[in-house]
């Protein structure tokens, strides 16, 4: 399966060929109408901070807590993240640093510079030098089950069963 952040051939464009379904948030600029989607859950944003940061001891982080800090944000990570990124840039109190993907190199560099990273919680606890703290920003990230535009009968039955469970 292709790298999720490879613009030439994304996982979403591999649906129906290499994979049947994918659980993920959604990025309109990256995936457009490449697949169908079924909303399964909403998850909160997290701010991943170095364990040595004073913010690491907080139970929640607000925009005010981030004033004057550098915050790494995945560009086109998902539509909700893009919207939050625009608001943070407009506010001007947080130095937003665009990144292209999440990997250990990103977190290593962020730790060296004392930067925070905006995530949906999936990276929380993955890098040993970081802790994820819920971000009170008034929005959540919808997570979807993505499936092909023309699913096989088995995939459509699975999607229908998921939809029934979610209702």
Describe the predicted segments one by one:
Residues 1-6, 73-74, 92-104:
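Short beta-strand-to-loop elements that line the ligand-binding cleft
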Residues 1-29:
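Central regulatory/effector-binding core of bacterial HTH transcription factors
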Residues 14-24, 45, 94, 110-118:
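Alpha-to-beta junction loops
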Residues 27, 76, 122:
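Flexible loop residues that form catalytic
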Residues 31, 69-92, 155:
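Secondary-structure junction motif
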Residues 32-38, 42-43, 105-154:
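Beta-alpha-beta core module
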Residues 34-45, 49-71, 156:
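Flexible hinge/capping segments at coil-to-helix
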Residues 64-67, 142-167:
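Extended ligand-binding regions for polar small-molecule ligands
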């Amino acid at each position: 399966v292709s790298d999720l952040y490879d613009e030439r051939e994304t996982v979403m464009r591999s649906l129906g060929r290499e994979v049947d379904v994918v659980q993920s948030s959604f990025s309109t600029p990256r995936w457009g109408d490449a697949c169908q989607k079924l909303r399964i859950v909403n998850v909160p944003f997290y701010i991943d901070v170095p364990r040595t940061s004073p913010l690491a001891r907080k139970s929640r982080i607000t925009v005010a807590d981030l004033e004057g800090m550098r915050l790494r944000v995945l560009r086109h990570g998902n539509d909700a993240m893009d919207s939050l990124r625009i608001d943070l840039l407009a506010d001007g109190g947080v130095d937003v640093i665009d990144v292209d993907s999440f990997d250990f190199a990103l977190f290593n560099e962020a730790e060296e510079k004392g930067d925070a990273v905006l995530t949906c919680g999936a990276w929380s606890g993955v890098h040993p030098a970081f802790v994820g703290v819920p971000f009170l920003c008034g929005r959540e990230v919808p997570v979807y089950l993505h499936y092909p535009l023309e699913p096989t009968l088995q995939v459509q039955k699975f999607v229908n069963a998921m939809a029934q469970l979610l209702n």
